[in-house]
Regions:
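Cytoplasmic-entry segments and transmembrane alpha-helices of multi-pass inner-membrane transporters
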Residues: 62-101
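Membrane-interfacial helix termini and adjacent extracytoplasmic/periplasmic loops
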Residues: 20-39, 99-140
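Residue-level signal for discrete positions within transmembrane alpha-helices
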Residues: 44, 48, 84-87, 91, ...
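N-terminal signal-anchor/first transmembrane alpha helix
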Residues: 1-8
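Glycine/proline-centered hinge or cleavage motifs at structural transition points of membrane proteins
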Residues: 93, 168-169, 182
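Alpha-helical membrane-protein architecture signal
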Residues: 38, 42, 46, 78-82, ...
């Protein structure tokens, strides 16, 4: 209900402004200066797409490999704490992830950029507030979902798929990556 009311409020107040400046100009405008009545959101849209793509590039491989470990390799005494840790990560509010990013990740990226600058590999050191930082944090945020869904999908694959692959001479790794994961994609 609260989200619906927020959306109604935003649209009710935003539609007249979009009519005045034009929807296409609003979407494709490159400058956002409300005081000068310039309302372009293209850089925000492109930035969101970059951050999302970066998060997928970081989060999906790590999440799938963690799921493979948990479903196929993890000893029972390690599985329970690891499963609890991934479930705990899912319960952390996004504000806490953002705070962690500002306090920990931004300084690390800043130091990394400074090291690259000193080595002469980049022209400016940067301040750490970047698409890379946002992608890393968002990638961390999506890990619990990817790990949970991938692991449960892998466990749902019938055992005879895996056993049949091993019986045909495939290694354990090849059986996992060429049989189990493709079969789990539907889940």
């Amino acid at each position: 209900l609260a989200v619906a009311l927020i959306c109604i409020f935003l649209f009710a107040n935003g539609i007249p402004a979009m009519r005045e400046i034009g929807f296409i100009k609003f979407i494709t405008g490159e400058i956002w200066r409300p005081n000068s009545e310039q309302f372009g959101i293209l850089p925000m849209i492109v930035g969101s797409l970059y951050v999302t793509a970066g998060a997928i590039i970081f989060g999906v491989p790590i999440g799938i490999l963690t799921s493979v470990f948990m479903a196929m390799y993890c000893p029972k005494q390690i599985y329970k704490p690891l499963k609890a840790a991934t479930e705990l990560l899912a319960g952390i509010p996004s504000v806490i992830y953002g705070f962690f990013g500002l306090v920990v990740v931004v300084p690390l990226i800043r130091e990394f950029g400074t090291a690259l600058y000193r080595a002469g590999l980049v022209s400016k050191p940067g301040n750490g507030n970047s698409i890379l930082t946002a992608s890393l944090i968002l990638g961390m945020m999506i890990l619990p979902t990817i790990i949970g869904t991938t692991e449960s999908a892998m466990r749902a694959v019938p055992a005879h798929y895996y056993e049949g692959s091993l019986a045909l001479g495939a290694t354990k790794e090849r059986s996992i990556f060429r049989v189990i994961i493709p079969a789990a994609k539907s889940g």
